[in-house]
Every structure is written in C-alpha cells, then in structure tokens.
C-alpha cells in the first residue's frame, strides 16, 4: 500500500486500506499485537486528518470496503479503536446522507400506543452463513410476534432454505441488489423502530 500511496498520494482508498491492514490475521508474540494495534491507531488518526471536507465524497465510496474485522479477535479491550474507526465512518456517511437528501430515520416513530415494535434487520447474510447460524436465525425465530414485527432487508439476491425460512418468519422481507441511496430510502420509509445490522 505504501507504493500505491506514493504513486497516488491523494487516494482515500489506498490510505483506508493501509490503515486497516495494520491489523494482521496472525501474531507470533504479544509485542507484535501491541505494535499492530499502535500502528492501527496511528494510521486511523492520519486517515481522520486526511479525510478533509474535499475528500468526503471519495471517502463515502470506500466506507465498508475494508473493515477492521480481525480487531474483534484480540483478547484486549479495543473499544477505543473501534470508536475511532466508527467516528470516521459516521462523519463520512453523515456527509453522504446530507448530500443525497436522505432524511434521518425518525428517532420516535409514529405508532399506536401498545403497537408492535418494528425491528429492521439489515444484512447480507440472510442465508446459510455463520452470522445467520450463530445468532440471527435465533433472533428472527424467537422474537415474540405479539410484541415485535420483523422487517428483513437482505442486501443481495442469495437465496437458500434459510432465506425461505426468514421470508416466512418476517412480516416484511425485501431483498436484492440495490444502490446505497435506494436501500437507505427503503429502510427509512419502512418506519422501523430499531435497526439491527448483523
């Protein structure tokens, strides 16, 4: 990534990937872990400063492309690093939301007193997948249907028997390949009370 950055120093994408790639899959020593976490923190700080107002549009194209997935596997409190990463993502996507004129989801939805709570599940893993198998299937199947209404937004067209189960369990099921703005509007217009992104 350093070579790519040297060839294109204004690329948000290269710098984003370089920051994330401070985290390795395997470490030989505890010192290697500490060095990696420190490198990630330093590069996140640089990335935060690099993403100026002029670079927010490009950054919006990069959010979610690579994520600090392996950070969850460290047996160390990494809340600070996840918050720092999350702040960058939130700032970038807030800009995207304002630019695309997508109104924020209502913090207080209009529902009748005693009405069901609408739970929106937004995921690309509504199928046989570790996310579905480990916990999401249990959430979908076991939410009390007297109190909760499940809305599923499957962010792709992948279908299997587990997808069919989700379709029959949810009150509303939406799936397909759509752009970010289309999904954002569909989710907003559903007037869900809770958004869950597994």
Regions found by a protein language model. Give the residues of each.
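Alpha-helical solenoid repeat scaffolds of the TPR/TPR-like class and their adjacent stem/linker regions
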Residues: 1-198
């Amino acid at each position: 990534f350093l070579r790519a950055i040297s060839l294109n120093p204004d690329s948000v994408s290269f710098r984003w990937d370089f920051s994330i790639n401070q985290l390795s899959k395997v470490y030989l020593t505890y010192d290697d872990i500490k060095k990696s976490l420190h490198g990630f923190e330093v590069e996140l700080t640089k990335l935060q400063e690099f993403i100026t107002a002029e670079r927010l549009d490009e950054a919006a194209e990069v959010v979610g492309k690579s994520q600090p997935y392996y950070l969850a596997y460290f047996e160390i409190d990494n809340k600070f690093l996840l918050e720092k990463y999350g702040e960058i993502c939130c700032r970038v996507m807030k800009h995207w939301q304002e630019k695309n004129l997508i109104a924020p989801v209502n913090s207080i939805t209009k529902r009748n007193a005693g009405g069901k709570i609408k739970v929106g599940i937004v995921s690309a893993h509504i199928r046989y997948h570790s996310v579905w198998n480990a916990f999401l299937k249990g959430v979908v199947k076991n939410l009390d249907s007297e109190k909760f209404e499940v809305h599923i937004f499957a962010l792709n067209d992948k279908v299997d028997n587990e997808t069919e189960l989700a379709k029959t369990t949810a009150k509303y099921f939406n799936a397909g390949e759509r752009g970010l703005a289309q999904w954002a509007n569909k989710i907003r217009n559903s007037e869900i009370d809770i958004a869950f992104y597994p």
